[in-house]
Design a protein with these regions (language model features):
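Phosphate-binding loop of NTP-binding sites
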Residues: 12, 23-24, 105-235, 239, ...
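Short, basic phosphate-binding NTP loop
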Residues: 14-124, 133-144, 166, 419, ...
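Acidic, Mg2+-coordinating active-site environments of NTP-dependent enzymes
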Residues: 19, 25, 83-93, 200-342, ...
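Residue-level signal for inorganic ion chemistry
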Residues: 22, 53, 72, 110, ...
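Active-site beta-alpha connecting loops in nucleotide-dependent enzymes
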Residues: 62, 328, 346, 350-422
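Non-catalytic positions within long, well-ordered alpha-helices that form the structural scaffold/packing
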Residues: 69, 73-74, 191-192, 396
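ATP-dependent carboxylate/acyl-activation modules
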Residues: 125, 329-333, 457-463
């Protein structure tokens, strides 16, 4: 692939790519169109495509973009990229048409081409949990001084990361992205595309074991971020994580550590829980405060503080930004309703983040009943029963007044909790969401604190919405 010239402020105006650029980036085969043809942007969704954009036909789990090529052309697409020749309609000679073996790989190649046009730092964040909060917190801190570009929500996969990079514009000074994975090789590919200068790993835990097999597999996958940083890249790792702490012996590139009560460059001590958050001492010199009662958010804050210092922010500005940061939606977001308190952690779940959330619920200072509404943890493979049963035992020993489980896997949790001595009347299992809503509607009392958590596929946000509407 021919490397494009570095142009810091070179992407201006309406037209972004020429057909020649696309062919250089992807190595695709030109079927029609003039090399000087220019495109206003890249689209993978015919519903939102704008005139003069290039349409990539991507096959997803529930759709195939090749089925929408005709619609994209009707809406004014100036060209198409496809991988299934039998589904590609004939186009006019002036419409660009490019064949590639894999359109997802082509999207990544175009995104890398675009990223190389900008001489700006890219900060990449991965980990088994805490990616999104750390990304949002780091971007929030850095935006006090810089124009920061970031993923929207959790666009952290082989489609979302390229789309994020493709929306970098000349006004941006920094890009902060999270990298997700549930299969071997994805972090390696994402780093090839994003070419990060600073890599942050929040932790290593039992997540996506269905495809990564075990925690060692998770470690091998996540550590690809450190191995593939653009030279002389800097790695920033959580020393409170046992697996990551071992990397202090690796000298292939600069590695800095953050942690809680650890011997490291960015250290939090003197943790003090308050009704509205946590205060802590940064490097025994600066008192910091966060508006969250979850201890792991101190670790997330330490990563954001380190980013601020790396990029020249003064400690006073960093302190103010950290103090005013608000949690992303659906991630331990405390919602105070008239009758009860809802802790919305409904976006996703794995053993590590579930334990953190349960511990937060147990520390909550409000005096009402503590209710855990738990949905299945997905992608745990042959460890699924073991982990769900483990949490039944764990919960039975915690000051939790009521356990409500939902889904086929979490039934192992309710059964384990009962066998471990939790009162039968304090355990309710529901097969589906409608039964959960029916139970909560009849049984939630004034002053109760509800933690709602489950994997993305469980759509636990439906329960959060119900509680808001009920209030």
């Amino acid at each position: 692939m021919a490397a494009p010239a570095k142009v810091r402020f070179g992407i201006t105006g309406f037209l972004m790519f020429s057909l020649k650029d696309i062919l250089e980036a992807t190595g695709g085969t030109l079927q029609s169109g003039a090399p000087k043809t220019r495109f206003a942007g890249i689209s993978i969704d015919s519903r939102t495509l704008k005139p003069k954009e290039l349409f990539l036909a991507i096959r997803g789990q529930n759709f195939d973009g090749h089925d929408f090529i005709a619609q994209a052309l009707k809406q004014g697409a100036a060209g198409i990229i496809y991988s299934e020749a039998e589904k590609a309609p004939k186009v006019k000679k002036d419409v660009a048409s490019v064949y590639v073996p894999n359109t997802v790989m082509a999207l990544g190649a175009i995104a890398r081409y675009h990223r190389e046009r900008f001489d700006i730092p890219v900060i990449a964040i991965t980990g088994s949990s805490g990616k999104t909060t750390t990304k949002e917190m780091a971007a929030w801190v850095l935006s006090a001084k810089y124009k920061v570009h970031k993923n929207q929500g959790t666009q952290n996969n082989l489609i979302g990361v390229p789309l994020t990079l493709l929306s970098i514009q000349s006004q941006h000074d920094l890009c902060v992205i999270e990298l997700g994975t549930n299969r071997k090789g994805e972090i390696h590919r994402l780093t090839q595309i994003a070419q990060p200068n600073l890599g942050i790993i929040t932790n290593i835990g039992p997540a996506h074991l269905e495809f990564l097999e075990n925690v060692k597999g998770v470690y091998k996958e996540k550590i690809e971020l450190v191995r593939n940083l653009v030279s002389p890249g800097i790695a920033l790792l959580n020393k409170s994580d046992i697996a990551l702490a071992r990397l202090s012996r690796v000298k292939t590139r600069p590695i800095f550590f953050y942690g809680i009560n650890r011997d490291c460059e960015f250290n939090a001590t003197e943790i003090n829980y308050k009704p509205d958050g946590i205060s802590f001492s940064f490097n025994n010199a600066h008192v910091m405060e966060i508006r969250h009662c979850a201890l792991h958010n101190v670790s997330n804050a330490m990563a954001a503080i380190a980013c601020g210092l790396f990029f020249g922010l003064d400690i006073g500005t960093i302190r103010e930004r950290i103090r005013n940061f608000d949690s992303p939606e659906m991630r331990l977001k405390e919602i105070r309703l008239n009758r009860c308190v809802v802790i919305d952690d409904s976006y996703n779940s794995n053993p590590q983040s579930l334990k953190q959330a349960i511990d937060l619920l147990c520390r909550h200072g409000q005096g009402g009943r503590k209710i855990l509404i738990m949905g299945d943890m997905m992608e745990l493979g042959n460890k699924s029963q073991e982990f769900h049963a483990y949490f039944g035992n764990y919960i039975s020993k915690k000051p939790i007044d009521l356990l409500v489980t939902m889904g086929s896997f979490s039934k192992w949790t309710s059964e384990s909790a009962r066998k471990s001595g939790m009162r039968t009347e304090a355990i309710v299992h529901c097969d589906d969401c409608s039964k959960v809503l029916e139970f909560l509607g009849a049984n939630v009392k004034e002053g109760d604190i509800l933690l709602i958590k489950g994997s993305r596929a469980m759509k636990m946000e439906r329960i959060v919405s119900f509680m808001k509407e009920r209030d």
